[in-house]
Amino acid sequence: MTDSREYTYLYRHNKKINQVEMIYYFGVIIIVTKLILSYSEIISISPLFNNLLNLTFVFLMFLKVLCTFNLRIKKVHIIFALFVIMTVYTSIQIDNYIILFTALGIIALKGMNVKSIIRISYYVKIFWLTLHFFAFIFAIFCFPNSVQYSLIDNEVRYRIFLSQPNTCAMLFLWLIFEYMYLNYEKLSFSKFLISSLFFGVIIYLTKSKTSIIVYVLLWLLIWQNKRKCIKKLIGFFSKYGYIILSAFFAFVTVNYNNLSFSRILNTFLTGRLAGAAKTYSTNGFTLLGQYLELGKKIEWDPIYRVNSIWLENSYSMMFLNFGIVYAILIAIALWYASDYLTHKDKIFVCAMLIYGISESYIVNIFLCFPLLIVASAIYNKREYLKKNYNIDEARKGECYG
């Protein structure tokens, strides 16, 4: 009789857990769909529907938090509440709600399996990106005049109906990275060839240099991770890389006109440093966010040699747009999480940090997942390895060559 009652209790308890987890998973489907459609040129969503998706996601994350946390108020609840208030303030200031969505996604992570979250995100992206890719193939053969492209430095760059070439490449790159993360222990040379063939087509169309560099570097890190020096480098860079890169780019931004190498580096990064330096000269750094008219045409500046303002370097963007406070929080999180991350996790964190040099998407945990892993590792601490990745799996990840 006792065994029967215990079984009934466990069944109901597990059913409740699954229902609570489904709230988060549904939120992931909503936000990933919203983010991709916000870039789409073939599926236009109205501002009203966009706001509805935003509010639905926020509601689901709050519901998940209410279902997970104890109703007794603790210090951690107050900290989370203040964190949300801070991100709401920043989001209103900069007119961009990604920082709020990331904060809510992190707070609601308690008890979640991060691998399952990435898997859900992966399948949603597969659906939408496949739709756009085949729509592009159909259009390019049947209605070639309807396909728009960007002409940059005499290069024709297609965007596959996704806003702009770099954004398109980013979405496909992190889709492939999600596949690699989920199938890390099964990666092989044949899988490398297949993924490279597909991504090669994307790169041929978009001409995104950043994406191909990060893609190649990630595979090199995976292949060479048996070497002790590479392991140590990955561990060090995943822990301190954000601090080092933030300090470096802040220094270059402030002293752009006084450094002999700044213009050479700016040319290599296709104008990203000059844009940040120009923004700093007119707006300065910000603690909790400031509004910038990114993309706005300005009068030609002969000193910085820019005629529009773009912030595509993640580190500069944090200081100039989102706020120094968030850069500090990310740096602390990466440092603290290092003790809980597996070697596999650290490899993908390194890829994110390198990607952030040329692109500004890394703070969005639903497009670039490494910060989601970091947050989960901190949140669940030792349970992270026990529940999501057992020790044997972690060792397999280290031995893959």
Regions found by a protein language model. Name each.
Residues T2-V65, A135, A351-Y355, F366-I373:
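N-terminal signal-anchor transmembrane segment
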Residues M352-L353, N364-G401:
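Transmembrane alpha-helices of multi-pass inner-membrane enzymes
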Residues M86-L129, I330-L334, Y340:
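Transmembrane alpha-helical segments and their membrane-water interfaces
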Residues N321-L353, K381, N388:
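Hydrophobic transmembrane alpha-helices and their immediate junctions
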Residues W223-L265:
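A membrane-periplasm/extracellular boundary helix in multi-pass inner-membrane enzymes
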Residues T130-P165, R263-I264, I303-V306:
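Membrane-interfacial helix-loop-helix modules of multi-pass inner-membrane proteins that assemble, modify
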